Amino acid sequence: MRRHLVTGSSSGIGAATCRLLAGPGSAFVVHARSNAEGAERVAAELRARGAQAVVAMGDLAQPGTAEALVATAVERFGGLDVLVANAGYADRTGLDDLTPERFEESLRVIGTGFLRLARAARAPLAAGSDPRVVAVGSFVAHSFRTDAPVFLASAAAKGGLEGMVRALAIELAPQRITVNCVVPGAIAKDAGTVSAMTPEQWRASLARIPLGRVGKPEEVAAAIGFLCSPPAAYVTGQALHVNGGLVI
């Protein structure tokens, strides 16, 4: 059985990743901070595909949440083989309105949350089969333009996340754990979910994307799925961009 913990998996990229990886012989901890209905819906879809699935709620900005999520995988499925750190949010608050507290919130959810997940997951991953860690970054840490929204706090948090991925790839290599990052560009949101950009900003973004469209969650999930697959066993410490050419 291949056992997965996918954070932020009640919708969007996280949900698409679970669907892609699900099948007989797989098991999932489906995580959400507040969207319990979405998480339960995803879990039901995974079970329909022959997978085992359990829902776990929690705010990764809070101490103890990451550890509890990993413990759920170990207790329910006997261990952990794949960690996908997808939870996070975009904050485009400008400098004048960005308080230190709000800035630190982005760092807690994205950076400190990933640190806690990695620390808690290290031992069960090392004992697992073909262990993988994939973090989900963002183009906002790479694309800075005067004609596009700037995400100051998110850029800092996601840029730091990529640095952590590279450092952990070195530290966890002796345990055969690969650590990589998938960096999405502008990706369509599921209906009913909140976007950090207005409809006008979404339309304007198309002009900056060489392929002329926003991406689909399933396209990002495909990159994550590759990094979790046997052919990616020799890939570690890398950032794989999925952005239609937005960042080249």
Predicted regions and their residues:
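Short C-terminal tail/terminal secondary-structure segment
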Residues: 225, 236-248
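Conserved glycine-rich cofactor-binding loop
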Residues: 10-11
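Conserved glycine-rich Rossmann-like NAD(P)H-binding loop of the short-chain dehydrogenase/reductase
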Residues: 24-40
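Catalytic loop of short-chain dehydrogenase/reductase
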Residues: 134-160, 165-174, 186-187
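Alpha-helical segment proximal to the catalytic Tyr-Lys
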Residues: 123, 170-171, 233
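Short, small/polar-rich loop/turn modules that mediate ligand/substrate recognition or access, typified
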Residues: 130, 173, 178, 235-237
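Substrate-binding pocket helix/loop in short-chain dehydrogenase/reductase
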Residues: 94-95, 99-107, 193, 201-205
